[in-house]
Amino acid sequence: MPPLILASASASRAALLTQAGLDFVRIPADLDEDAVKDEGLARGSSPKAIAITLAEAKALHVSARHPGIVIGGDQVLQLERDLISKSRSMDEARDLLTRMSGKTHYLHAGMALAENGHLLWSNAESAEMSVRPLSPAFIDAYLQKTGDKILSSVGCYQLESEGVHLFDAIRGDYFTVLGLPLLPLLAQLRHYGMSLA
């Protein structure tokens, strides 16, 4: 059986695969993600299509250099008409949380499988995230509690920890919110001979 490789630096994606009992190695793709996003936007691609394109680019990049089946994954946050990138500072995080307060945004999680530089499969799932109204005092307390670790998450939250306090409704798959729609991915891995038994 060929090795399984995760082409992502995401700790949450790695944790999901580990918790699912998969043996894999992590080899993050060295890509200019902003350039891929900008190219997709220039072509008029939807946010969901951009998430797929990012996942495919990561999987193809790593699979061209390393033998095995490679999982690429990426997540795009759509707020109104904008695609949101990770905040680079706590001030940017505060501004984003203020902007998201009382609004609904969408997480589009793309995933792809590639082997030997050839795409095997790709897909994306979406989740609708309704943020409750957040007071400035709550935002400050939240950022103080989470610290700068929150800058590693595109929406400045991790649903599996303190981030759950931001929401009053979520529609969509939990794994999609965490950045890797696990059930369709596991089905494809079984199709390619990767399973527990």
Please report, for each region that a protein language model flagged, where it lies by residue:
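N-terminal polybasic phosphate/anion-binding patch
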Residues: 1-69, 83, 137, 144, ...
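Residue-level signal for inorganic ion chemistry
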Residues: 17, 55, 74, 93, ...
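Alpha-helical membrane segments and adjacent membrane-interface helices in multi-pass membrane proteins
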Residues: 69-75
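Active-site-adjacent loop/tail segments of enzyme domains
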Residues: 75-105, 131-133
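Anionic-ligand binding region
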Residues: 110-122, 126-127
